[in-house]
Structures are given as C-alpha cells and as structure tokens.
Amino acid sequence: MKSLLAFGVLSFALTFCGLQDKLKGLSGGPASNSNVTSNNSNGTAPPNTTGAPTAEKAKPSVTQQAVIDGGTETKWDDQGLSWKLPSGWKKMTATKESFNYSSPDNAFLLVNISTLGDSFPMDVSLKAYYDQAMQQLKNGKYESVKMVDIDGIVGVEFVEAPPASKDDPRRHQWIAYRKYLGQTQQLNVMTSTKGSNFGKHSDDFPAILYSMKAVK
C-alpha cells in the first residue's frame, strides 16, 4: 500500500509540475496577461475566452448517484471543500495543502492545492491542460478527456488507459483553477488504484469526483 501511494503521489506531482512551470512564465506581471486572467473571485466557472470546449455539468449515472447518496460527507474545512466517500474509506492525512483518503482495498482519493500568483493565467493554463490531455488521448495514454463543471468550478477530467502491468496504478483525475479567500489556486483531485482493481471502482471514482461541493 505504501509503495502504491508513494508512486501515486509522485505521479500526481509529475502530471502537472512541468507544464505549470512553463505556465508560470506566462503570468509575468498583471499588464502582460490582463486579457486572459479571470476576475472571478468566488471560484465559479470563468467565461470561456481561450478556445477550450464548453464544459459540461457533472452528470453522475444512476449507479454513481446511488454511490453519492449512500456516501459519507467528508469535509476539508481548510479549503472549504467536501466529498461523499463510500463506506469504509479512512483519512490518511489532511493538511492545508493536501487531503488524502484510502479505501479498505487500497483505492485512494488524493487532493492537492497549489497556491499561485495573483496574475497567474488560469484560463490559459486550463486550456493548456486540456490540449495536453487531448494529445495524451491520441497517444493512447488516456481513455477519456473532457471539460467538466463540478459545483461551479470548471476543470479537465481524464481517465488513464489500463496500465501495461495490472499492478501499476491507474488514475481518474480532475484539474481545475479557482479563486478562494483571495488566493489563486490549482485544485488537483485524483482517484487511483492499481490497474487490476480499477474496474471495481469504475463507479466509485466518478461519484467521488462529482460529489464535490465547494464553499463559494
């Protein structure tokens, strides 16, 4: 379990670190990107000005909605976020920047908050993530990619294709940006388990993601 979690956390960071470093270069000063940064201060979806597809509202299936309805609300008070988790999921760690839970069979909810500069170009960054994910879809690394609005926050949702080894991790992830308490934040929500266990959680994972509620 520890090795799987460690690998998941490492991959979680590597998924966006390189791209985010490039995007930070775009943030420069306020004047350099005033035409692309969002003025939205409550974390709701910014207007679509970057050419990214219009986000669809999160729509759980009947089975996924049943998972949500039967789940236990788990709050991250430091960040004003909450999710509905299936029975038996337990807290591993909760800090101001990360929020991690696990299931009895080693599935994980791993959430990370990154605080960015006030002038960080959220819209441009989100479009870049979407474009990168679409390229990964074409390359066969991802099984599906879409823009999804979860409780008023627009993000890129993607599901990894089955790994080469059934013991390697497979992830269902959603990356978004928001303004919260005066901060510009990247919100990275990942559900993960080993490849052989992924099918068992094929409804749990989207249900967890779509159950998110955010204080506005």
What are these regions (language model features)?
Residues M1-F7:
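Sec-dependent signal peptide recognition
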Residues L5, F16-F108, D168-P169, T184, ...:
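N-terminal targeting sequences that direct proteins away from the cytosol to non-cytosolic compartments
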Residues L10-F16:
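Hydrophobic h-region of N-terminal signal peptides that target proteins for export
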Residues Y101-A128:
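A short acidic-to-branched-hydrophobic micro-motif
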Residues N112-F120, V145, T193-F198:
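Second-shell loop/turn segments in exported
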Residues D131-L181:
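Signature of long, low-cysteine stretches enriched in small and polar/charged residues
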Residues L187:
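Glycine-rich phosphate/pyrophosphate-binding loop shared by adenosine-nucleotide-utilizing enzymes
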